[in-house]
């Protein structure tokens, strides 16, 4: 019996190793294009802080700037409908690719912490010569968006946080010690990258991953799946995502965007849009955020999960357009009262 158990275990382990190795090989064959060659002609690269960041634009150059920051696995094109909706109102919409996703340059030293990412967002404002903008951050992009607002508060007219993964704890909190098994996994690059190649950057799993974030699986349409898959041909995407994982799963320090006092001190309007059925960042996180920020408004989208702009684009864009309009009015009122 014991001999049989060990044989079965060895066979299963060998099968797992072969699967991981196979998908790693496929990733290496697929991820061969330079970002500049793979990127769509609808955008361009700008130097932002330490990296060349890919951006896409819509709307008049003299419109109210609205800068979009996407979530995990997405890229600037995921905001296309929202950008068009804002451009139709006269706003200037700018969406960026936050590394390691999309087509932006990846940092050689794996600097993916929220503060580094926040500096890149401010760098995009610098690259465009933008004095003040409305910042829109979704999911994992919410933390860097908030970091940008804390780094340069005078550059932010308003915040729009969409199902934001902020990990707000307490002001005296320290970065938690990750479990030993997780530390070992993250530190073992060949294993880490093999798992990433199998599940995260594997086009065969794109639809399943997307469906795991939304309430209605049918909303993961072929068009959306292809959109998410498009950057997966960029050279070294798998090792870049692998290098990003420690910043997501085992950060070494508590970011300013994770401290309640950072929100209590915000002086700009904060518009919070949250899916009622979000299982990734549950609604109570959005409700807590609305209580922390003094100038916050919470809008809850019914029967929507973690990605409102995919699940109910018309409803989301209506809320977004209203939020940006309110931000413009409040900014004008503040300027006239000086």
Task: Describe the residue ranges of each PLM region.
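Alpha/beta-hydrolase fold catalytic core
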Residues: 1-64, 88-91, 130-131, 324-338
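Conserved HGGG/HGGXW glycine-rich cap/lid loop of the alpha/beta-hydrolase fold
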Residues: 58-103
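Conserved hydrolase catalytic core segment
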Residues: 131-175
